[in-house]
Amino acid sequence: MIKSQKKSFHTGTVKKTIKIKTSKDKVWRKISNIIGLPTWLIDVKKTIYLSKKKRGVGAIRLITFTDGNEIEEHVVAWKDREYFTYIATEGLPLRAYVATISIREKSNKLVEVTWQSYINSKKMSEKQFMEFLAFMGSFYDASLENLKIILEK
């Protein structure tokens, strides 16, 4: 007899950090362009605005991935040259997804970029949730590495 895994809600976090040898302004220009994701996020086909507002709290974007999946995100916090926070409202197997991308100048030409998120799943098995967290961690790592390569050119 095969025991089925009980499905329930799960909560977790993902946090990834990378150091980039460039100016804080250059990093901020790249990450604060909220529809510029195809230039550094892996597997993103296109990103468009869903709001008239293009920057800051209230800006909304729709991300289309190469597999056709779409995610709608709303900017809910913004501090120029320091961080922005966004929530996903559609497109993920989650009840809640809140993420912040922040930058901190370590020295004149060294910037630390941190991408962290809080995740609360829809009903799924613990194994499925752990696989999802691992996927998100890999996605953040690969995307931050792309950002580093682009900005250190």
For the regions a language model picked out, list residue spans one by one.
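Short Pro/Gly-enriched beta-strand edge/turn motifs at strand-loop
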Residues: 1, 42-44, 54-57, 81-87
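Hydrophobic ligand-binding cavity/cleft-lining segments
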Residues: 1-52
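Short, P/G- and charge-enriched loop/turn segments at secondary-structure junctions
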Residues: 2-6, 59-61, 87-89, 101
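Generic structural detector for well-ordered beta-strands
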Residues: 17-21, 48, 62-64, 74, ...
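Hydrophobic pocket/interface hotspot
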Residues: 26-31, 37, 61, 75, ...
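A conserved amphipathic terminal alpha-helix motif
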Residues: 112, 118-153
